[in-house]
Amino acid sequence: MLKNKILATTLSVSLLAPLANPLLENAKAANDTEEIGKGSDIEIIKRTEDKTSNKWGVTQNIQFDFVKDKKYNKDALILKMQGFISSRTTYYNYKKTNHVKAMRWPFQYNIGLKTNDKYVSLINYLPKNKIESTNVSQTLGYNIGGNFQSAPSLGGNGSFNYSKSISYTQQNYVSEVEQQNSKSVLWGVKANSFATESGQKSAFDSDLFVGYKPHSKDPRDYFVPDSELPPLVQSGFNPSFIATVSHEKGSSDTSEFEITYGRNMDVTHAIKRSTHYGNSYLDGHRVHNAFVNRNYTVKYEVNWKTHEIKVKGQN
């Protein structure tokens, strides 16, 4: 398990000074102090928390950016959710049979944020809507007075006093918001379509990933080699998502947030069959959402006064 770490950074931002290039954002998160401009209209106080679960094959790297704005009548917090979700793709004999092999693989990756605090409201998040592009890059910007806006790419930050960016790769998958309200947001990164040797196939195709070696005893050989699998199936997914929340000043000192990373798994069966002439071939069969919500959830406590982050529980 990765060692928990608390990272504190205070930024002084003037009304006129925009944030420096967000492409360097991840590196800057490791610095002790960063100052921009000479004023102190905004303070950005940063904390980082890492949690890993070997049981679920998940690492959460969460950046908590407290926005202290003298011209905003609420507390604000930007949560950037990064880390790694292992694919947990596995191959095995189906019910100890010799002619049916199975491949369990992630049809969907789940990323979610939730709070039950009545004084906290979700005010912005990234990504929004449905995104089909392989490479996703977006920026959330902040201006004095509590104004959060999103920009389509890493270069769209020039007019912001402070900004936070996301960037991730989702080859053969699409991102979309599945649920969203004032207390929560849930994203699904879902399998879409795949280029195969026999042409383009839908993520729901029963023969997807079925291979060409019906005489092998190894379950792995019943399916296509690693070179034909996209990274999100072969290894896993590196999320990069943002949610921004507001908190009523003078209400509760602390709030709790549940952050969830996980996956929904499909199972593809490769069944050895024979033609009338005795030739063997593999036939595919799919079980969609065979294992759902295989999720790792961590409960974080945020202190609005001291800006401390505590882990209150995990499954």
Swiss-Prot record:
GO CC entries: extracellular region
Name by which UniProt lists this protein: Gamma-hemolysin component C
Signal peptide: 1-29
Molecular function as annotated in GO: toxin activity
SUPFAM superfamilies: Leukocidin-like
Function recorded in the entry: Toxin that seems to act by forming pores in the membrane of the cell. Has a hemolytic and a leucotoxic activity.
Subunit field text: Toxicity requires sequential binding and synergistic association of a class S and a class F component which form heterooligomeric complexes. HlgC (class S) associates with HlgB (class F) thus forming an CB toxin.
UniProt keyword annotation of Signal present: yes
InterPro entries linked to this entry: Bi-component_toxin_staph (IPR003963), Leukocidin/Hemolysin_toxin (IPR016183), Leukocidin/porin_MspA_sf (IPR036435)
The keyword RNA-binding appears for this protein: no
Pfam families: Leukocidin (PF07968)
Native species: Staphylococcus aureus (strain MSSA476)
Similarity comment: family membership: Belongs to the aerolysin family.
